[in-house]
Amino acid sequence: IPPRAARRSTTSGIADTVLKYGRQRLVLDNHRFIGNVGWRQNEQTYDAFTVVNRSLAQTTVTAGYIYNVNRVFSDESPVGNFRMNSPIFNVKYDGWRAGTLVGYGYLLDFDDLPANSTRTFGLRFAGGMPFGDDLKALYTLEYASQSDYRSNPADFNLNYYLAEGGINTGRFTAKLGYELLSGNGSKAFQTPLATLHAMNGWADGEPAWWLNLQA
C-alpha cells in the first residue's frame, strides 16, 4: 500500500485499551522523540499499529510498531516519507503528587537511511510543587542512552541530558534549562521524529543571513 493510501481503524472493545492501525497522530511526552510537528499546515503523521492501555492505576502504556512516517513534505518530495520497521514503547506513571515518571524505548530501523537507525532508552521525570500564594515550582529531569541499531554501519553509544527548573505564577511561566545531545566526533545523538523546531533554540531562531554576517 502506498504510504498516503493507508487506512485507519480504531478498536476500543478491550477494557481501558485503544487499538489503532493505519494513519494516525503520535505525540509522546514533550515531542522530543516522537512528535507531529503540529505547527505545519501538513503535520507529521505515522502509519502504525499502536496500543494504548490504562488498566493500571495512574499508568498509561503506549506500545506500537511504525512502518512509515509521513513527513511535512509532499509525497512528491524524495524526503516525503521515512519507511521503517520500528517498535516503540512509552510507559507513564502520574500517581505521585510531585510529578510524572516516564520510561521509554524507541527502536528506529530505517529502510532507506540505515545511518539513522538507532536504539534509544530513557527516563523522564517532570512536575511541579505549589508554594506560597499562586506560585508553583516547576522541574524536569531526563536522561536517555542511544546506540546504533540494526543495519546502521556505525558503532556508537551516546547520551542525552535535560534539566529544567522554573516558576509559574498562574499568569506567567519562566523556565531555565540545560539540554545536551552528546556526540563522539563522527556521530551525534539524533531525534529524527521529533517536533524539531520546538527544540532547536537559538540555532533555529535566527535567519541564516544574520548568522552569516556574524561569522
Model feature map: region roles:
Residues A5-I14, F49-N53, F89-Y93, L123-G127, ...:
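Residues on the lipid-exposed face of transmembrane beta-strands in outer-membrane beta-barrel proteins
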Residues D16-R23, N116-Y160:
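Surface-exposed extracellular loop regions of Gram-negative outer-membrane beta-barrel proteins
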Residues R23-L28, Y65-V69, G105-D111, Y143-Y149, ...:
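Transmembrane beta-strands of outer-membrane beta-barrel pores
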